[in-house]
Every structure is written in C-alpha cells, then in structure tokens.
Amino acid sequence: MDNVISNIQTSLHEVHGRFETSGLNLTSLTSRVSALESGIDEDFSGQLSLKADKNEVAKFTSNSNVVTSYSVSQLGAKINNLEISDDNLQSSKVNKTRVSIALDDNGNDISDYTLSQEGLGNKLKVMDNEIGLRALTSRIASFTRDGVLTNLSSVELGARLIATESNADTRALKSEVSSHTDAENVTTTYGVTSLGAELHRIAVAVNSLDTYVLKTEVSRLESNGVVVPEYTLTQTELGAKLKNIVDSISNFVVNTQVSKNYDEGTLNYELNAYTLSDYELGAMLERFDTTHLLKSQVSKRYVLNADGSVSNDFNSDYTLSDFELGTKLFDIDTLLNTKISGEEVSINTSDPAYTLNQSELGTLLKTLTGRIDLVSPADADSSIFALKTSVSTHASNTAYTLSTTALATKLESMDSLLSSHGTLIDSKASISNMNERALQSRVSLKFINNDGVTIDEKFTCSVLELGSLLFNMDAATEAIARNYVTDEELAAAVATAVATTGALTSTSLLTTTVSTITKGGSSVVRTAADLARAVFGGGDSDDDDDPPPPVFIYRSEGIFRPANWGSDGNVDGYSRPMIEGRENIYASDGTAQDLHSYIINLVAGNAKVFYRDVSYTSKIRLLGSSGSADDKAAQYGPPASTSYFFPAPASLATVEAGLSWGSSTTRTQSDGTTLSGYTGGIHVLSCFGTSRFEGRSESRKVVWLTGAGTAASSTLDAKLAFDGTGGDAPIHVFGESTTKYGLDLHDAGLVMRNSQSNAKIDIKYHSSNLVFASLTPNVIPASPDILESILTIDSSANSVGIAGGASSQYKLYVHGGANFTSGITSSSASITGNNNSIPSLSISNTTVGAKKEFKMSTDQDGLIIEYGTATSGVVVMDTRISMNDTFTTVDSVGTNSGLEVVGKLGNKASMVLRHMPNSDNTKGTITLGRYLSIKTDLDASRLYTGYTSLDATELIYMDNSNVIVKGDLSVSGNISLIDTSVTPNTTTNIVSGISTALGRVSTLINGGDLSMLRPDGTSIVVRAANIESIGHPAYTVTDEQGVVTSVERTGLFLRPDSFAVDDQIDARLTSVGLTEGDGNENNPLTLNVYTIPQIDGIIAEGHVAGSVSRIIFSSSETLGSRTFPSVAITPINNPFITNATITNTIVGIKRVTVSGNSNEQGSGYVAGDTITISDSFGTGTNAVFTVVNASSGGVDGGSTSLTITNPGAYTSISGTPIVIVEENPTYPAVTGITQQSSSGSGTGVTFSVELSVISVDIFNAGKGYVTSPSVVVSGTYVDTVSNTTTTSGIQSAVAVLHTTSNVTVLDSRFSKAATLSISNTATQLTSALNGYVSTSDLGDELANYYNIDEIVEGFAPIAAPGETYAYLSTTSLENYQTRAASNILYQAKETADNAYIRASDLTASGTGFYDKTTSDERYQAQPASGESFALASSLVNLVDTSTTALTNYSTTNEASTLYQAKEDLNDPYVLRSTVSLDNYDTTTTINEKIAGVSSHFTKSGNNITYNYAGNVGIGGTPNTKLEVYGSIQALPITDTSCVFGNARVGGGAYAGYAHFTHAAINPTHFGNYALLQYSSGHTFLNCSAGSGVGLSFRKNNADWMEYQGNGLLYVTSGNTRYISYIGFQYNPSGLAAGIMAGTGNIVVSMKVLYAIECQRILVVSDERVKTNIRDVNDHEALDIIRLIKPKKFEYIDKESAGPGTIYGFIAQDIIQHVPECVKKGPGVIANIMDTARVCNGRTLIFERFDTSNLKGVNGTIQVLDVDGKNHDVIVETILDSRTVIINKDLSAYTGSVDENGVPQKVKHTTTLTQSEYDAYEDKSDIVKDGDTYTRTEYSNVGDNVFVRGEHVDDFHTMDKDHIIAITTAALQEIDRQLQLEKAKVISLESRLSALELKFGV
C-alpha cells in the first residue's frame, strides 16, 4: 500500500512539474491556443486562403497506424473525386465505413452495435419506433389494489398530466400519478406533490421510511409547457454507446421521478425520502400489498402463565398483521362487544376468580355497585366504570389519553383516514419486559378533584392491580352482604321463632333460619342466633373470624356491617361504632313498634343491649341483665366488660342532665380491688366523619358524671371519651349561664381523639379533678378545620379557666401536631386565674416524691404566655412559670423534669415568654425546683424571654436550689454542687478507653471552668486550674525514637475514666450550649448546635500523625480465639475520606488451661517454676507461664494452675493444628501444646491456650472522619459456637488528631460501636450474643457463666440459635446441672450418637449418662473390627461387661444402641465387646510384635517385616504386593509434602522410563501416560487421545495456555519459521491466547488486544485457490475512492489501543460504499470506561457513568478485574443513574484501580529468618539479605473494578485488503487519465509552438 501511494504521488508530481515548468496549466494552455487560432481567422485570412492548398487541414490514422494528411487542395480534390465517383461505389463506401464500434468484455466487436452510417440510420429508425412504442407501453407507475396490479405507462401518465392544466408548475403539483380505490369503492388520486406529501405523512406515522435510499434525480426543464431537449435527460443519455442506449431505456423509466415532496409554503421541493422515482414508488406501494399486510405483525399478545407471569408464546387470536388489525379496527364497535369484551382486563394471581374479561368485570362492578349503594348512593354511576377506564395514555397531550370507547373511536377514525390512502399503521411495540409492562399498563385512571393533572394512585390501576382491587372490594362487599338482613327478614324470622316455640329461647335462636347468603362461592345459612351474635358480639356459628360488635345503622334497608372494618373489628386502632337512632320500626304485619319493644322481643336472657325510649325523662337509659326497663334502667350502669355507644340527644333544654348515671353499688375488679360504681363509661364515636357531642343548657350542667364517694375516698375511673376520624373537633360544650359548669367531670378522665386535622386533649390520670368553667356563647371558632391551639379557653367572664383541687395531684399533657401553632394559648386570662399574685402556669405539690410535670411536644411554638400592655393604674402581670417543690432529692436528668419542652421545628421556639414594649424587664421568670429540659431534634431548641438574649451559659445539672434565669440577663442560684468528682486526665495525650467523657472549652458563669459531659449525660466540671493543660490548642507527643513533636489540636478530645460498666453508655453531646441571640424570636438562644473539628485519622500513644502508629490492646480485654485473630478499622459514621488500615498484627496468650487428666499434667513441677511454650507453636516471641498449683509433681488441671508471666508476641501460629473438640467445647481448641523449657526439672505437661490481640500497627491513619472509628477484633472464640463474633477491648485506645478544618455537626456523637467491649477488674464483657462473665470466681471451666445468687452486675448469657447453655445455680434446675454436682465437668447435651459422662451418680434427670465412679480412671477405646489395641497392663484399666454399672453401652450384637462415648479429647472409650478381651497385647509381649497382629509381623530395629507371601492392601483387597486405596502422603524431612491422589507411579509399558498416570487410565496402553521421563532427563508431558482431551497450563489454578487438537506446535532454536496444523484463536474471556488445532493446513487467525510487531506478514494469494476472478472496473474504483473519507481519530480505550492520533477509516462510513469490506458480529465497545465500586458482590456503583446510556437490562457488560482479566456480566436491574445489579458475584476480583482501570498496588516487605524462609514453598519473591531474607509482596485492597463497555451484536470489523485493491484500480484509472492529459498537453504545446513559430508570436 505504501508503494502504491508513493507511485501516485510521483505521477502527480511529474504532471504538476511539467505544468509548472511551462508556466501554464491545461486550461490556460487551451485558452491560449484557441485565442491564437481565432486570431488567425481574423488577421491572416488572406494568407490562409493562399496557403490553403499547402496547409494540412485534415489528418487520419488508419487501423494499421498509417497517418494520412490532407491540405485544403488535397481535401478538395479528394471530395471532388468522391463526388464524381460512381454512386454505387460511394454508397458502398458509406455502407461499409464504420461510424460506431461496440466491443464486448473480451475486446471483440459486437455486430449489432458496430455499424456503418447506413446501419446506424436504420438502427436509429428502429430505435425511434421502439422508443415511441415504449413511451406508450412502458410502466412508470404501478400499485396493487385488492390483489390487482395496476400499471401506468408514460402515455397514460402524461395524459393525466396534460388533462389537468397547461401550467407546468400547477400540473406538477396536481397531476395524477397514483390512484387508489378502497374496499368501499372510494377512489383517491394523487399528484406528484400530494403523493409526496401523503408519503411523508405516512412515514411520520409508520416511522419506517428512513431505510429508503434516495436515488439520483433525473433533471427536467420545460418552457411554457414545451420540453427543452438539451436539459431533459431522456434521449440524450443514449448518445455515447448504442449498447448502453438500449439498457438506458429501462433505467430511465425506473429512475424517472413520479413523486416530489414540495414545501407547502414555497412550493419548493427537497431531495428527500418522499421525492421518489417510479421504481421507489412501486416499492413503497408494494408494501401495502395484501400479501404484505397478511405477513406484517403489528400487534402481539403474550400468553399469561398460571402464576401470572408472561410466557414467550403468543395468543394467535391477538397476534395480528396490519391487514388483520385493519379488519378488526374497521368494525371496532362489534369488537368492543365481542373480542375486546372477552379479553382479560383484570388479573389476580392468587385467586383466578378475579381474573376477568370486560363482560365479567361489568357484571362484578354492577354487583359491587349495588352493594356499595347501600353505603354511598353517590357511587351509583359506577356501572359506567368500563366506559371511563383509561386504556390509552399520552404524557404531553391529554387528547390521546382515552377510555375504551374513546380509543375505539380514535382508531376507527385513524384507520378510515389512512386506509383510504392505501396506508398501514405499523404499531409493533418493543416490549422489553412483559411482566413490568403488565404491571404498569393502566386500565383505570382517576384524577384528584378531576383536575386532569394529579393522578389518584389509589384508583389508577394496572391489569394486575385492578384484579387485586376487585378481590379486596368483593371481599369487603361480600362481608357487607354476609350480615345484611332487612327489617322485614328480621321481623319475619323472629315472628317465626315465637310462633314455633311460643317463646323466644336460646334453642329457637340456634335453629331458626334467618337468611341464606353466598360467602366465598358457597351458601351459608344464617340463623337468628347468628344474627344476634353478629349484632351484639361473639361472631356467628361458622369457623371464620368475626369482628367484635359491629356498627349498626338503623335505616329503611335494615342493619348491616360497614365494609371498612378491619379484621380485628377496629378502624385506626379504635372501636368506632355509631348509632343513627330511629324511634319506630315496623314488624312483618305492618304494626309499628317502638325500638324498645322491638329489641326486647328479639333478644332475651343475658344479652345486654341499649335502646332509645322517648317516653322517659332521661334521654339515655341502660338495660342490665335482669329487671325491666321501667324499674331498672336508671339504676344500673353499663357492665364493666363492655362500653356502649350512644347518639347525641337532639335537645336537652328541659332535662336535668344530658348524660347521667350514678351508683353506689360496689363491684370487684379483675385485680381484686373493690370499686364503687362501674368502670364502664360513655363513648361517642364516628366511623365516617364528624364525631361530636353537643349539649346546650341555660341553667343546668350539660354533662355531669359523678361517683357516690367523696373526693378523698372515691376511686372511680369512669371516662368520657370521644373519637373521630375527620371533620369537626370532638367535643363542643356551650354553657349559657355564668353560674353553672359547661362540663363537670368529678373524679373522671376525659379522652378526646381525632386522627385528622383537629385538636387532641389527653388527660390520662383517672384520679384527676378537672373543671371546665362555663363558656360565654360563640367562643368556639365558626369553622374549626384547623384550630390554632390544642385547647382554647376564654375565661374572661369567670375566675378560673382550668383548675384542680387544692390538694389534688394532677398532670396536664399536651401534644401538638404538625398543624398547630402552639400547645396552649392563654389569652386575656391566666390558666390558673387572673390574680396578679399567682403564676401563669402553676404546678405545685408538697407531697414528698410526687411527680409534677408539664410536658409539651410540638412542631411549632411550644408554650406561649404573653400579656398585653398595662393600662393606667394597673400593675403589669408577671409572665412566669413557677414549679415549687420542697422535696430535696435531686433526680437524674430527664426522669422527673419540672418543665420539659421538646421542639421539632427549626424556626420555632420551644418556649416563649413575651413582654410588651413598656413592660418591666424584671418581669418574666422561670422558677424551677427541678430541671429545665429544653430539647430539639434539629438545631433550634430555644428559650426566649424578650428583647434581649441571655448570657451564654450552660444549664445542665442543677441542685435542689432554685436557678432563676431572668429577663434582665441576671442568673442566680448555686451551681457549685455540680458533680466534680472526676476530672479529665491532663497528663496523657491519648485515651485509655472508649468509655470516655467529652469536653468542650467554654466560659461558664463562675469564671472559666471547663464543662464536660459523661457518656451517661451527666456533667462534670474541671476548674480553671486544669483548663490550661487541656484547652490549649497544642500538645506534645514522643515517638519511638524519642523525638518530641508539637501537635495541633482544637475542639473536642476524648477522656479516660474508670467508671463501672453500667456507666458506659453512648457518649452523646447533649450539653446546653447557649449562644448569644439578636434579641428577637427568630434568633433566640440556641441549644445543641456545635462545630467539631474534622478528625484526620487515628494515631496511637507516642506517635505522630503520618508515621506508623501502633494500637496497644490489653489481653484481658479481648476474648480468647481458637484461630489467629484479625483486626480492622471500621468507620462508625459517614462521611469519611479514607479509612484507616492496619498491619503487623501481634497476638499473645490470653488464657492457658491444663487438662484434668494426670497423664497430661507432667511430673517434676513445683510452684514457682516457669515454663516457656514450645517453638513449634508459632512464629514470634514465646510465651512464658508460672506454675501456681502442682500436686505430686504434676501441674494441677484447670485454668488457674498456670499464670501468664509473658503472653508472648506471635505473628502467626503454625506448629499445632487446630482441632475442634465438640460443638460446645469444654476447653480451648488450640490444644496439645508442649513446653520448650522449664526453669525447674518439670517435664511432660501439655496445655491448651486461647489467643488475644496485643497490638497492631496503623499502616494508614485514614482521613476525614467526623467520628472516631471503631477497632474491631474478629476471631473464633471458645465462649460461643458462633465463628463470627467480633469484639475489641482497647486499653491504649485511639486518640483523635484534629485539623483546623471544622465540620458542623448537628447532634453528632462519639459513640462506641456494638462490637466494642469495656472491662474493669471486676467484670468481663463478652459480646451481645454470648452474655457476660460473672463477678465471682466460680471455677475454671465455668468461668464464663454465673451464679444466680452471686451475680450482681453481669448479664445472663444468650445461647446461639439451636443451642443451649449450662447454667450454674444454687438450686436444681430442670435440664441443668447444679453447682454442687458440677465439680469440674458440667452437663453437656446428648446427641444421636453419643452419651456423656456425668460427674455424680445417676439421678432421675440423668438418664442416658454414665457414672464415672464405676469406670475406674481409664476407658478402653473401641478397636477396629478384628483388631485390638495394646494396653499399659493386663486389663487393669479396662471396662467391660463385667462392670455391671455400665448398662448403656452396645455390644457387637446390639449395634443400634448407644455405646460409651469418650469423656474428652484425651480420654479413651469404653470397649464394645461381649467378652473379656483376649485379643490384645500387653507391655510384656509387645517388644517385637505389633499389638493384636504380632504373628504376622516381626520387628528388627526400625524395620518391620511382613512374614507371609500374600499381598498387603490398605483400604481394600490387594492384587499386588502393596496397594493403597486412597491418597498417599509422604513427608520428607527437609522438603515440603508430596501428595499423590489417584495416581499410578512406575514403568508400565515404558521400559527405562518413570511415568505418572491416573489410576483410571490403562497404563499398559502406549500413549496414556501423563508424565514420562527417561534417565537422560528428556521429559514428556502427555494427554491421551479422545474427545475434549487437552493440555492446560495453569498459574494460580487459572488457565493461561490451553492446547486442544491434533496439530503440532514447534518452538525451537532452529530454522522452523512456520506454524503447521495450528490455529490461534482469541479467547473471548480475555484470559490469554488459546490454541485450537484443526485438520490440515488452515488459515491462521489470531485476535489480540494490543499491537503486533513482526518483520513480515505473509498472506495467501495463490491463483489456484481462487475462483470467479474478475477485473475491477477502474471507473467504479475511482468513484468509490472519491466517496471514501479517511479520518484522524483517537481510541477511547487508550490503555488497550494506545494513545495518540490514528489515521484510518470509520467502518460505518466504509460500509455505505464498500459493504463487502465490513463485517458485523459480536464485540465489546468502550462506551463506559469507568471505575465502579462493588457492593454486596453484585451491585456496581459507577463514579461517572450514567446508566441511562446502557442498552437496558439483560445487556452484557465487560468488567476488568485487578488482575487484568475480563469478566462478562449481565445487567439484571438498573436501580438509578449510577447503580446496577449484575448476575455475577465480583467480590473476589475487586481492588483499587485508577480511572483508566490500572491496578494500584501497595508494596510490603517482610524480613524472614532461615527457618521461615525454608518453610515457604514458593520462594520467587524472596531475596537473601545478609543473614536474613526479605520477602516482597504487593497487595491491592479495595472494592473497585473497571468497567470497559457493553457487548454489542453489530461490532464492525473491516478488511483493508478491499481498500488496497480498490485503491490500486483507482490509481490505474488516474494513471490512464493522466496519460491522456499528458497527450493533450503535448498536442497543445505542439500547436502552440507551431503557431508561435509561424506567426512570430
């Protein structure tokens, strides 16, 4: 290619150089010659005529290259000779002279087109006739209608054009070029313009015309209706070659435009998809052929599965072509009643009965409407539900949001319009998720308030939602119908019962049928008893759940239960019945009965009912269980178990009381106490709206509830309660007399509830006295939709607004909702009175210990008490809150606060005490006997007392003396008693525990003391003398090298203390930090707003930030671990910038335990000996123990016989394997550890240990915390069966280093995480799942449990799921072991296979356990079948069947029963045998024999000989001398282990070779070996032949090279330079190159991600492997080259493709011109190129990429992990613009990568000893450094991956060989044209030179 391009450049330079040399270009040269020649004609005409006979005026070159020239005279003579020649001769010459030549592809003449003049004339004549004929018959327009093809010739089309108008423009616009007649014989015709416009409109609707390729327009010009031939390209294109003329006739017809699309405004047309030739028009019209219509699907319906999901199958009835759809739309009205009505419009997956079609839906809706009409007749028009349901929506144009009928009309209109033009509508939808579509498609639509904008989501339903809604509605209305019984039915049933039985008894109630209804699809018979139970409670006779007594509405239709009852009979959590009274009811005979008689006749016995009787003075009477209404109604109140419900009396003007009862009858409560009167109350409630009690009286109490006893002795707790869900306030009391109470409740509570918009009052304490003074008329707001206050009282006409008795105890609790301005607003009068000498709000009591609280919680101003301007002569009243208390005990904060105001809204004050402008600033006080607690959830809990704000002060903890904050800015009171018992540590720069106090430097009222908060919220004060060392912004630290550094510190610090565990709660900044306000309500004094410095990481004691710091742990503060524990830094709260990381974890021994078995306790030890742990235990400094208790030379068992002198310092444990003894281990799991040395003579002791963390180094301190991070220690602890418990106990814990960058935090906290633990010398904390350690010493093994009688501060342990724990107790607990019987062992659970030893004799609760006392000291382990074990002596320590106490073991004949289980790890088993053992060896016979099989083996020195000639087999029957069935493990002394699994090792069929073969492969078959090596060292790696057999080369268990096939791959040092029988194929997973062999020589294909560098590329080009070889048309090639557009670009993925500018092509451009050059297939595009964080393994959170640019769900994206490997994952869910969920867990592939996907690795070096070096199997990363070794590792810690892009199915690849071939052909054409131009230049130059020479120019 480079050479070709170079040749082109050379040729171009040559031509350019010649032109430059001559100073002329071709155009100027031609012009000059023409000018000279013109000049000759003018200036030298005379000379020319004289020299005409000599001048050469004609020249002819024959086919044999003979040149003949003619002068003027010669030419004339020639012509004269021709003229005088014989005519025949002349005709003959004319006939024979060729004037046209046509050649075929081989260069031979085509006789039909190689013609003389005569032949040409004849040919033209024939052609003229043909053209004329063709003009008459040629098709230039065609279309198909009703299956009939219609063609229009040019004559027919021209006739139509001429017939319109003479004006060409008008004719072009209106001429008919297409005509269409529809099925109803309506004909539509189109001109060029109208046809183009119609096609444009169709294209907009169909949206499918963008695929048409615009053809080259044929030019045409007309003048006054006459065609101008020169510019009408019809016949002129026939000029050059006769062969092309014939072809051009059909080409011209095909390419002639017959439609144009004009701009409607200017009548100018554009070259676009709607300016079409006849060919294009025919193709478009062909689209509307009926065949096309039948085949093109424009609607699809998926089949629904039984579970409601959507299958991939189609319902053929509704999967339609556009033709079929048009047929259906044509008759849309019929379809509405037939097909559409049969389609499902609601789906309910749980109950198919509610999966309905439109017809069924209408039936159900009619039924539901009929039921609902009983409740709300306004819903009667629900029958038109289906007509109004929206089944079509449009987001921007409501004209296209249509109901079913409107949609049908719209579709019919559109179809009529389009079908009349032969147009189809392609409405195929792209359904990406049918389930989601089904859920989101609306079949009902409702707007809120009919505004047409705001959708009411409750009634806008999808198909599935509608099914569920109908299910719920039907269930509700069915419940109504279930208990619906009309008056007539009820009266008839009662009459029947009375007539049948003579009296209404319980028996008749049970048997008399009242009604039969349908419930749940089956008939249910209701008896009178059912009705009674349904009416008065108790449910009906069936087994379903019935609600408690329902709501009854007496109306003409009868009694029914409302549909909105919950399953528990309640609405909004309260019972809400209601009575709508009616005085009369009619029996079946039409006789009027009063309601009293009606109910009495209906129900007898103990049924307790209510009624309304207009004949009695008292408007409400109660009927008890006995007596008549006349004499008992006024005597008995309602029973205690039931509250009855009454309507409001219509008028009470003439009665004593509206509601009244009283009784001196005593009754016994459920708790045994005796009360006077009844506890039942009166309730007035509403289900639907207003709940109101109204009463008016001129002179009487409207409501008076009183008990019989006096105020001192009465214990009545009757209530008056009002509930409502909406509408008005619950209670209105109008007193029209100033002498009587409006509402008088003596010893009664008042409850008013309203869950909607109005006020609530809740006075809950039933022994309260509350009097509502009579109110003046019209004080209640006229429209109390939202009252301004919770309680509004105007007592301007009376002395008291709210008052209690002088000696009473009461509380008032007011809770304000979101819509209320203030809790209590007292206007013009005080709450307790209007006397100037009493407080505005007074809560006082002299009783010791009594609670006196005023609590308020509100979103607005909490408490406002204000007075107006004083008038002349009147003293301004004090604005005060007074709480007096003589009780001296100071309670803790928040327990009995005197005044607590909680504010929840930032711009409102919690408490406001206002003065008017002329008030005395000394007024307005807060006098507290206890605490003032002001809290907020935001940032503005405020105390505001007037124009000026208080001094900055902190009121945190007050003693019992009064602290008064006055409006004059003075603060009085003694705060010296604030707790100062504990002061901060002022000498240490770090914290010694998480149990910290928080401090802040403040200026206090006593002059500069430092106020601090303990974690429990109490306060401490550090006097001014201590502030300097704490509060200064700098302190010094000393690092390990002794360098002293000054460290900047601001703001908060952590402080150590030594308080007990129960004091260590979350440390919370709750101090009252008062700051100066600006004197107005909008900026009062502010609490709890503070700024803390940003924590810039963590450091440890004595270290400087940025250096490697260390966290020191106390071994007593982290639990023992059976594995090497890990430590991590965990941020407690966000935000933070970088999390800290740790390294170099050092652990030590936390606890050491010696077994209770004497053989493990050693000998020769005495108290005081020190024991050093064995070197084999682990790597690091060995631990040292001291012997405390030793008996008979052995260390006593337990955990107290050894103390830890030095816990050691280990970086790993490797010497002892970890063995888990049992599920609930008795001892620690790291067992069997021996000593390295002892200071005495003791030896042989073994012990078990637990590990704890000593220290970790901070590798990276982290940055940007706002709260101190948590240090989490993880491991497997012996105290629990869980292996995920975490804890950390930090003795030298973290300190915080602050920067000067402050972060504002609202109510932030430094809190201990749940994973932290705190300890002191008395108590040990484990974790939340394991309980607490006892404070008493209960023995070694039971150290983690506690004694009920002795524990003080501990907490009971919590068992893990499915497990139980043993507890110690002073008493016998069932299934637990008592302490007295525990000794060392405790009772463990019995499993299916094991029973455990019990320490005491068997008791009744000990079934299944063994008595240790009868089993001596040892237990024989169970031998294998046919074998025995050697004992220490002859059956001394053996337990067998002769030991009668052991009755629960198995013999060989009782295999199904239990056998004796081992006691612990080191105790043997009880023998399972029926006889005394006789097949064993003792120490006297074992010297030279193997125990149990001594006759077969002999021993000589270290050698063992098998004395028989047979074979030895391990795990199976041997066929050779030695066979092992299973793995063989060899452990060399100096090398790592070699493990052979299913392996054969030997010679086999390969003499002289060692081979390695899988056991399943026949070793005698040559070629089946895996590894073969000869003594010379020549090694063969082999795989046997077979399908799928191959070789894989792996690294880290991942394939890096794979070979499959039968070809050869040569890699030699010789001259082999080819690959034979091999194909390299790119591995799609991106791991490496895979090699796949084929058969025979195949084309080598290789795909790589990066560049290939080589000396040469050889391409197969042998002619013998090619066929159908043709020359490239040079003209076409040049045309293509002109269209191709080379580009400059850069690649998106620069990491893979490389940076820099690339010169090349765009495949999408090339495919337009050379489609053969471009192939499309699957590939990955780099359209994401972003780092993503992996959460929970399958969630990707991108940093920059917007997920809206993805193709959608189910698309595949390529992820690059930190090892450079690609992973293809599928997007399952797109959560938001940055987050997706994928189908593959990427947790194992994450790390830290930069924005280009390059892994960011951190280098770690470790110094190794010789022994550590020898232990490593892979030493590739270890180098020797003097006497030690240095190992270098790289880590990549993080949770990121790099996402490259998406997989696509149309990835474009280009074969540039096509471009080379086309370029070469184009160059040849350029060269030919260049040669012609050269010849022209030479000719012109010759002519020019001749002229210049001749004329002297």
Swiss-Prot record:
InterPro entries, sorted: S74_ICA
Record keywords, A-Z: Coiled coil
Domain Peptidase S74: 1661-1888
PROSITE patterns named in the record: ICA
Coiled coil stretches, renumbered: 1865-1894
Protein name: Uncharacterized protein VP1
Taxonomic placement: Viruses, Riboviria, Orthornavirae, Duplornaviricota, Resentoviricetes
